[in-house]
Each structure stands twice: as structure tokens, then as C-alpha cells.
């Protein structure tokens, strides 16, 4: 079975070869994933290195091509650049499969024009959410409820990365709000949750336990990721996270199948779905759900 890592970075400071990356990713049990382009100069992670948008697209596209068809290129876009909306069309034409946005210097509402264009070109958006180790004042732009403005972009597919740590409870509530936006207000928004650390291992049990016991089924919307990079793919960290999550969901499933909370029961009845097996949350997060996010399958 193909195992996807949905959160892999490229860096301008640390060039990487596809061959070396594939050796490490294969050793960790990863056979595909979403690779994020070198960051734009406006992001602190660029460390002042200014590479034109098209060149950054080409670099990640060519790297993915060299790695094989199960690796998908994602363009990291700065929505404050004057031609940001035009870059979305260019990204589609260049073969990008998704957009990456980090709100380091602006509120998520500044992303709306780019996100509307992303809907037009059928490109999903991976947002950073949660605290940022970026050395600047950015926390107030990255809480889950800051992304309520995405209700103004019907048809958008987007993901919140890192389960929004440390605002994980807010992330759960936001997920519920988006479910309601679709059912009651026909927004046709698809929200995914990227579980890349981010959220430390000591928090993960309670986060996923609360998702489950509230009746919010992540079977088709959870994305497994590790948030490492192609130049120094951390096989030990990847293996640890895979094994940790596999065991976590198996242990949570026993409690979940015997839980009869009022809200969870109401959610299950409204969705007219059987109670999910939480082992499927893990299996799908590492396999089918990235393809769902990218629109390969529904």
C-alpha cells in the first residue's frame, strides 16, 4: 500500500537530490506525498532569498517528476504579492496540484481573492494553522476561527495544518462549524485536517479522542504529515510518528465503539452514517485522503 506524507518542505538553503530523498523516504515507509515549494521571500522561512514564483514552481514540479508519480507539487504563494491572483493561473498551468499559504503578515481574509481563484482552477489550499516558530508577531493570524472568512469562498477545498496547536479545541469547533455551513447554508466547502506535528505527541490522544467523541468523523478528511524536508528527511521522526498514530487510533477505537454521548449520537443520526472505525482514520490519512484533497477521488 502507498503511504503518503502530506507535508514535506523544500528549502532554498539546503538543496536536495531526488535520489537521496527517495532513499530516506523509502526507508521510512513513505512512498508518496505532497511536496511544498521553496517559500516566497516575504515569509521568514525564506531567510531573504528571493526566487521568482515561476522558478519556485519549476523547481518543485521537476523534483516531484524525478521522484515519481505519487509525489505531488504544491506552490507556496504569498497572497500580498501584487500578481498573486495571476500566480494561481500560472501554478495550474505549471502543473501545481495545490497551494500553500502561511499568514505570517496578514489575516486570512487577505487570502480571499487568491482562494476564489483557486476554486476557479480547482486547486486546494493548505493553510498553516496554530502557533508559528517564525520570530514575528503572527499568532493572531493563525487561530482556527480566523479562517471563518473562508465561508465567503464557496466551493473551496482547504486544510488546516498541525491541528492548529495549541488551539486544538478551537480547531475541533471550527470543523463542526464548517460541517454546519455545508449542511445548512450549502457552502460546498471541503475542510481537511492536516495532523503534522505541530501538535506534539502528548496532545494527540486528547485531540483525536475529542474529535471522535463529538461525532466528527475524520475518515475522509484527515491528512497524515510529518513536516520535515526533502534535504534532510528525518526517517526516525517519520517512523515514530507513523507508529505512534497507528497505535493511538487502535487504542482509541475501543473506547469510541462503546461511547454513547448525546452529541455524537445526534451527529451520526443526522449524517445517516454508521459509526466509523478509528483504525480507518489512520489508514485513510496515510493513503486515500491526500488523493481526496487533490481531487483525484471523491
Which ranges hold each PLM region?
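Mid-domain alpha/beta scaffold segments of enzyme catalytic cores
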Residues: 1-113, 117-121, 194, 285, ...
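Residue-level marker for buried hydrophobic side chains located in beta-strands
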Residues: 2-4, 125, 159, 224
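H/E-rich (His + Asp/Glu) clusters that bind or coordinate divalent metals
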Residues: 15, 157-159, 163-298
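Divalent metal-binding pocket/active-site signature
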Residues: 15, 79-82, 93-177
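A general structural detector for well-ordered alpha-helical segments in enzyme core domains, enriched
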Residues: 20-24, 56-63, 87-91, 110, ...
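Alpha-helix termination/capping residues and helix-transition junctions
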Residues: 27, 93-96, 152, 185-188, ...
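Short loop/turn segments at strand-loop or loop-helix junctions that form parts
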Residues: 35-40, 126-130, 227
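Short, flexible/disordered intra-domain loops and linkers
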Residues: 40-54, 133-142, 233-243
Amino acid at each position: 500500500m502507498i503511504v503518503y506524507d502530506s507535508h514535506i518542505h523544500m528549502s532554498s538553503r539546503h538543496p536536495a537530490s531526488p535520489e537521496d530523498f527517495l532513499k530516506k523516504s523509502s526507508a521510512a515507509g513513505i512512498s508518496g506525498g505532497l511536496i511544498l515549494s521553496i517559500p516566497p521571500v516575504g515569509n521568514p522561512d525564506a531567510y531573504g532569498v528571493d526566487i521568482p514564483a515561476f522558478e519556485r514552481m519549476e523547481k518543485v514540479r521537476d523534483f516531484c517528476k524525478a521522484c515519481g508519480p505519487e509525489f505531488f507539487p504544491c506552490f507556496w504563494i504569498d497572497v500580498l504579492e501584487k500578481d498573486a491572483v495571476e500566480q494561481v493561473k500560472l501554478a495550474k498551468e505549471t502543473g501545481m496540484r495545490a497551494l500553500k499559504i502561511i499568514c505570517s503578515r496578514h489575516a486570512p481574509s487577505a487570502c480571499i481573492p487568491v482562494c476564489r481563484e483557486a476554486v476557479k482552477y480547482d486547486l486546494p489550499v493548505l493553510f498553516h494553522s496554530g502557533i508559528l516558530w517564525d520570530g514575528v508577531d503572527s499568532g493572531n493570524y493563525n487561530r482556527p476561527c480566523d479562517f471563518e472568512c473562508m465561508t465567503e469562498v464557496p466551493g473551496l477545498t482547504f486544510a488546516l495544518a498541525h491541528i492548529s496547536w495549541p488551539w486544538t479545541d478551537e480547531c475541533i469547533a471550527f470543523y463542526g462549524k464548517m460541517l454546519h455551513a455545508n449542511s445548512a447554508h450549502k457552502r460546498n466547502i471541503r475542510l481537511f485536517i492536516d495532523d503534522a506535528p505541530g501538535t506534539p505527541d502528548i496532545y494527540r490522544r486528547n485531540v483525536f479522542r475529542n474529535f471522535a467523541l463529538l461525532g466528527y468523523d475524520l475518515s475522509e478528511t484527515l491528512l497524515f504529515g510529518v513536516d520535515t524536508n526533502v534535504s534532510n528527511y528525518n526517517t526516525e521522526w517519520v517512523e515514530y510518528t507513523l507508529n505512534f498514530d497507528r497505535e493511538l487510533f487502535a487504542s482509541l477505537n475501543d473506547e469510541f465503539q462503546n461511547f454513547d454521548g448525546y452529541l455524537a449520537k445526534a451527529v451520526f443520526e443526522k449524517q445517516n452514517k454508521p459509526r466509523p472505525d478509528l483504525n480507518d482514520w489512520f489508514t485513510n490519512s496515510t493513503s486515500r485522503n491526500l488523493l481526496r484533497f487533490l481531487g483525484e477521488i471523491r
